[in-house]
Amino acid sequence: MGIDPGIATMGWGVIEIKNERLKVKSYKNRPNPTNHPNLTLIDFGCIKTPPEQVMPQRLKHVYRELLKLIKLHQPQLIAIERLFFGMNSKTAMTVGQARGIILLATANFPKVEIAELAPLAIKSRLTGYGRTDKNGMKEAVKRILKLKELPKSDDAADALAVAICATMKNAN
């Protein structure tokens, strides 16, 4: 399962390898998805919070929805995009809170492995270029997962990119 952290919108995506949800022994030794014929999409979407809610309520909503998703999909690995320190401090603080909620939710499932991936590494692994734009990332996700159309949500597409990248060797 890949997650693109956010409070207003948190993207998530679940992929499967060889009919097993990321059942590979070690995160460091995962196969390269561009050479992997059995990488398939299971599900993806976004957790959205109402902007009029106060932050504690938004965090609680994200937490509860994420718990439901983890229980439903039972991933063996949850991959999270690392903070990009070039963003402004208010955005970084909000994304940091979202990441904390993801880690807290994951802590309820001790057998679930956690991987944290840098945005630049994700882009370069999937497209060969670390400064790829959103459409380039969506195209890569579409190609790798053999989708008929691009994911509409940037957040869900980013989460799928994180999940795909987590299956690759030395992704971080």
Q: What name fits each language-model region?
A:
Residues 1-20, 28-172:
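Phosphate- and other anionic-substrate recognition elements at nucleic-acid/protein interfaces
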